Amino acid sequence: MNTMNFSVQFKVRGDDFGGHFINGISMADSESFWKCKLVSADDDKNVYESADGYKIIAYHVKKGDVFECYTVFENNTDSVVTLDMISSFAITDLDFDTLHRATSFWSAEGKMLSQKLTDLNMERSWSGHGIRIEKFGQVGSMPVRKWFPFVAIENSEKNEFIGVQLYCPSSWQIELFRYKEPLTLLGGLADFDYGHWCKEIKPNESFTTPKAVVAVGDSLLKVCDMLVKAQQPDISPVDEDLPVIFNEYCTSWGNPTIENLEKTAKKLQGSGVKYLVMDSGWYKEEDKNWWETIGDWNVSKKLFPNGLKEVNDMIKSYGLVPGIWFEMENVAPLSQI
């Protein structure tokens, strides 16, 4: 496809919700959006002004193979404005027939789910009146829970694909909806209805959404490859050969003693495994469970009275590289900090 029609969707508290039976399902297509007028557009952005005194700048900056999208909302009024929804990206006038999503949970593999829009009841209504919508996302601090913050749509006749990834480490949502024929794809922070998100913006202040990246290609694999490369992953040279890592958690279940680790090291010697990683429990305090003291990261004197050097030297003696497990973002109830 040669061009994409980038747009924006937002909802200011106090304005009417959208019509066509969308209320309660989505905050898109609201009065806030319809009170806006496109005042300028160029290759990088669309600028909208509202009759109520807001200015919205929807960026879609081309960077390499992708478009980097985000939205800036400026409150140019004399009153505090509460945003209940605002998109990081929105693309309109789409003619596609298949939706691709990636599903997963904690401690699970990602799986691609591909569905025809007809299987999702996304055909227009007989009168064209009722909006059809497929909305998904997750609420909480786990960016991937049930769904990846990713979507791709496909026109199977033309072999056209659009892929999107949200850079949103919090509650997020993605929506595909149609009113009559054209489809609209949008996403960003979870709205007030879905994720109880809102943002108060004082007079002469602004709010910038998290970013999204958008890729266009002739296969699902290509657009996914573009989205990954857009992250500019910094791959360490030690990972270039995809070394095999053995994590010992399922052998000691949070009790990684020297004796347990040596039994494992003996089994792994000469197997082609490069790393032996000691998992949870190496820091646990006496008479406490390993999950109750996460956060202090003090070496257990009971498990390792001579410190970690002794166990590290033992692991190395079997031709393995020692590793250690942390969850630096976690603090448990019985930790000292």
PLM segments and residue spans:
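Polysaccharide-binding surfaces and accessory modules of carbohydrate-active proteins
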Residues: N2-Y179, G195
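Short coil/turn motifs at secondary-structure junctions
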Residues: N76-D78, V216-G217, E329-V331
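Primarily single-stranded nucleic-acid-binding OB-fold modules
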Residues: C168, P182-L183, S252
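Short, structured beta-strand/loop micro-motifs enriched in basic residues and often containing a Trp
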Residues: T184-H196
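Short Pro-Gly-centered flexible turn/kink motifs
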Residues: K199-G217
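Terminal connector regions
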Residues: A215-P243, C250
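Aromatic-lined carbohydrate-binding/catalytic grooves of carbohydrate-active enzymes
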Residues: D239-I337
